[in-house]
Curated annotation (Swiss-Prot):
One of its GO terms (cellular component) is nucleus. Residues 234-293 bind DNA. The lineage of its organism: Eukaryota, Metazoa, Chordata, Craniata, Vertebrata. GO terms for molecular function: DNA-binding transcription factor activity, RNA polymerase II-specific; RNA polymerase II cis-regulatory region sequence-specific DNA binding. This is Homeobox protein Hox-C11a. Its main location: nucleus. It comes from Danio rerio (Zebrafish). The keyword Acetylation does not apply. It comes from the Eukaryota.
Length: 306
């Protein structure tokens, strides 16, 4: 009897508990969000989230607001991360064209909340802004700086690095141009200074050996030298010999430094030259060999007085 009474009480209690739990479940079912339903549940905002989070932001979208059941889902997804940790961007950045993304820094200044609450006006402003407007960039796009990779805190390093490389490149270009000008101005003077002593003994030998030079010719030569001394002298091509003629003359000079008359006439007939041309060429070649031997001895001995 006692057991039956207790069982009856237990059964009655369990039935009451079951009915109360079922009532609670039915009450909660009225607050459950069903995406297949077309009605809007106003009690959804009262449901607490299971994760610790900051105050979630309400976002309005440029499309029609008839699909209002999507908004709480967006609200929950944006509320997962703390509001102070990350700077949220618009989800439609991938849908914008390249020009819209390039001119994203030209938006009028406003706070983050205003930008998020007025997303529709921002989207329309992307298509109607003027490229010449120079408004400061807002907090809505503070995640990325000028280098499109690092935050804006690294912009000063980015600018100094680029300025230093630009200045170095410009400085190097200026130095190279100055060096080119200096070398170009010094080269003809050095060449003329090096060729003048080579030319003078040859000219002297030609004038002394030919016997055709007079005092008037020397005066004219001195006058021409004085007139051209101010300008960089470039040695004119005075050699009328061909490569074949020079090769044969050099071969004969290698065997005989001083050529006799018979060999000289033979070379003149073979090379289609005059006797005088062959004789003058050998004289000049001997002076050149003498100068080369002197320079060679000075180079190997190291004595500049020779």
């Amino acid at each position: 009897m006692f057991n039956s009474v207790n069982l009856g009480n237990f059964c009655s209690q369990t039935r009451k508990d079951r009915t109360s739990e079922f009532g609670d479940r039915t009450g909660c079912a009225s607050n459950i969000y069903l995406p297949s339903c077309t009605y809007y549940v106003p009690e959804f905002s009262a449901v607490s989230s299971f994760l610790p989070q900051g105050p979630s932001r309400q976002i309005t979208y440029p499309y029609s607001t008839n699909l209002s059941q999507v908004q709480p889902v967006r609200d929950v997804s944006y509320g997962l991360d703390p509001s102070s940790k990350w700077h949220h961007r618009s989800n439609y950045a991938s849908c914008y064209s390249g020009e819209d993304l390039v001119h994203r820094d030209c938006l009028p200044p406003s706070t983050m909340t205003e930008m998020l609450m007025k997303n529709e006006s921002v989207y329309s402003h992307h298509h109607q802004h003027h490229p010449n407007s120079s408004h400061p960039s807002t907090g809505f796009y503070t995640g990325v700086g000028k280098n499109n990779v690092l935050p804006q805190g690294f912009d000063r390093f980015f600018e100094t690095a680029y300025c230093s490389t630009d200045n170095q490149s410009e400085h190097c270009l200026q130095k190279s141009e100055m060096n080119k000008l200096e070398t170009s101005s010094q080269q003809p003077t050095a060449v003329s200074a090096a060729r003048e002593p080579e030319k003078d003994p040859e000219d002297e030998e030609e004038h002394t050996n030919s016997g055709s030079c007079t005092s008037a010719a020397t005066k004219d030569g001195n006058a021409s030298k004085s007139s051209h001394s101010s300008t960089p002298r470039t040695r004119k091509k005075r050699c009328p010999y061909s490569k074949f003629q020079i090769r044969e003359l050099e071969r004969e000079f290698f065997f005989n430094v001083y050529i006799n008359k018979e060999k000289r006439l033979q070379l003149s007939r073979m090379l289609n030259l005059t006797d005088r041309q062959v004789k003058i060429w050998f004289q000049n070649r001997r002076m050149k060999e003498k100068k080369l031997s002197r320079d060679r001895l000075q180079y190997f001995s190291g004595n500049p007085l020779l």
